[in-house]
Amino acid sequence: MILGLGLDVVEVARIQRILAGPPARAERFLARVFAPSERAYCDARQDRATRYAARFAAKEAAVKALGTPEGVRWLDLVVERGSGAPSLALDGLAADAARRLGVARVHLTLTHDAGVAVAAVILEGTGP
């Protein structure tokens, strides 16, 4: 059963402006929003702003799918990249919210084209 659905679109230029802006501001944003593994992945790519935008969209989509629970931090939501499709790891209050909803699986898809990054998150489970 589908327990939650979230969709988000991020303009890549918005993230590019942050990355190209004052270094201290960019670092604060990256440290507050992205886990070290996400940063390592994005920073190793030529299109890093696009990669960051897709991950930011994934986090926004996940929060929407969870019902916008209070207190969830960006770092409670981590996009992981194994050998296949990206996945979303939940920690902290995000994991607590998922448990309360009865979430068994989190599905994530990312795409980017024409200056935007899009993410969709589907929460699947049996319910509370």
UniProtKB/Swiss-Prot annotation:
Gene3D superfamilies hit by this protein: 4'-phosphopantetheinyl transferase domain
EC number(s) stated in the UniProt entry for this protein: 2.7.8.7
Names of required cofactors: Mg(2+)
Subcellular location per the Swiss-Prot or TrEMBL entry: Cytoplasm
First-listed, main subcellular location of the protein, grouped into a coarse class: cytoplasm
GO function terms (MF aspect): holo-[acyl-carrier-protein] synthase activity; magnesium ion binding
Keyword presence, Aminoacyl-tRNA synthetase: no
Matches recorded under InterPro entries: 4-PPantetheinyl_Trfase_dom (IPR008278), 4-PPantetheinyl_Trfase_dom_sf (IPR037143), ACPS (IPR002582), Ppantetheine-prot_Trfase_dom (IPR004568)
Keywords attached to this entry: Cytoplasm, Fatty acid biosynthesis, Fatty acid metabolism, Lipid biosynthesis, Lipid metabolism, Magnesium, Metal-binding, Transferase
Assigned GO CC terms: cytoplasm
Family, similarity comment: Belongs to the P-Pant transferase superfamily. AcpS family.
Alphabetical list of NCBIfam families matching this protein: acpS, pantethn_trn, PRK00070.3-2
Function: Transfers the 4'-phosphopantetheine moiety from coenzyme A to a Ser of acyl-carrier-protein.
HAMAP family, sorted: AcpS
Name assigned to this protein: Holo-[acyl-carrier-protein] synthase
The organism of origin for this protein: Anaeromyxobacter sp. (strain K)
